[in-house]
A protein has these predicted regions:
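N-terminal [4Fe-4S]-dependent radical SAM core
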Residues: 1-31, 37-54, 67-74
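Short glycine-enriched, charge-decorated loop/helix-capping segments at active-site entrances
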Residues: 46-50, 148-154, 222-230
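Short cysteine/histidine-rich metal-coordination sites, predominantly Zn2+-binding motifs
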Residues: 53-63
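Pocket-edge positions in alpha/beta enzyme catalytic cores
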Residues: 53, 84, 150, 181, ...
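Hydrophobic adenine-recognition pocket in adenosine-nucleotide-binding enzymes
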Residues: 35, 85
Length: 251
């Protein structure tokens, strides 16, 4: 008799029972560990290292999640955020597959950084997206050089993921963190809007104002906080970004 296949394990940073900003309706939000990006505004740098996460199987997480199913209504479900969920793509696909088998709406909150159209990785991404109802794509900066400064990574694969999601008609929300002196210039916002307007699958655009609530975590981990001295955007700049990006629900 062949040995029983070992169940996949994911490394989880934290869980949120009643998420209201991570997808439609009320969400059970699973924050995974591990991320290759080093966003200067990251408020969870303690998620960067996958090894610090708590191991869970898909069944264990779903057992926790369905306790709150009565609060989800027609719109709610589970959202996997991070960290970067696509770094644990095999586990994530298994989790979403089992969730869909129970009729649970699945949302992927991703930076898009691990995306590629090449090789086995692309096949895994395609399998994941088949069991993903909604993708929330975080576009940190439209300018590639500025994106590298802000996150340590290129934005080319991120923008290509947006294009691919458009090609396959996968529902998508786009979120953009508004950081003074980094991503809030009108030129950048106008270019980002033009890119978003070229896509046909975007259901919603959101501006997320930069905040300093996670700055203390950098210091606790022994890291220098790169945005020291930069204040959150003013209401005027937030309003300006919302106007330039035509934020809100799209038909």
């Amino acid at each position: 008799m062949s040995e029983e296949k070992k169940e996949l394990t994911g490394y989880i940073h934290s869980l949120e029972s009643f998420g209201s900003v991570d997808g439609p309706g009320v969400r059970y939000v699973i924050f995974v560990s591990g991320c290759a990006m080093r966003c200067q505004f990251c408020h969870n740098p303690d998620t960067w290292d996958m090894k610090v996460g708590t191991p869970y199987t898909a069944d264990e997480l779903l057992k926790k999640a369905v306790r709150y199913k009565g609060y989800w209504g027609k719109e709610g479900g589970i959202t996997v955020s991070g960290g970067e969920p696509m770094l644990q793509i095999d586990f994530l696909t298994e989790l979403f597959r089992k969730a869909k088998a129970q009729g649970i709406h699945t949302t992927l909150d991703t930076s898009g950084n691990p995306f590629t159209r090449e090789g086995e990785r692309f096949e895994k991404i395609r399998k994941l997206l088949k069991v993903t109802d909604l993708v929330m794509l975080d576009i940190k900066h439209i300018d590639d050089e500025q994106h590298k400064i802000l996150t340590g990574q290129t934005n080319r694969n991120i923008l290509d993921m947006a294009r691919y999601l458009d090609e396959i008609g996968k529902p998508m929300w786009i979120r953009h963190v508004l950081v003074p002196e980094r991503s809030d210039k009108d030129e950048y916002l106008t270019r980002l809007d033009a890119f978003i307007q070229s896509l046909h699958n975007v259901q919603k655009v959101e501006v997320l104002p930069y905040h300093t609530l996670g700055a203390y975590k950098w210091k606790e981990l022994g890291y220098e906080y790169p945005l020291e001295g930069i204040d959150p955007p003013t209401q005027e700049r937030i309003k300006n970004a919302n106007q330039l990006l035509h934020t809100g629900v799209r038909v």
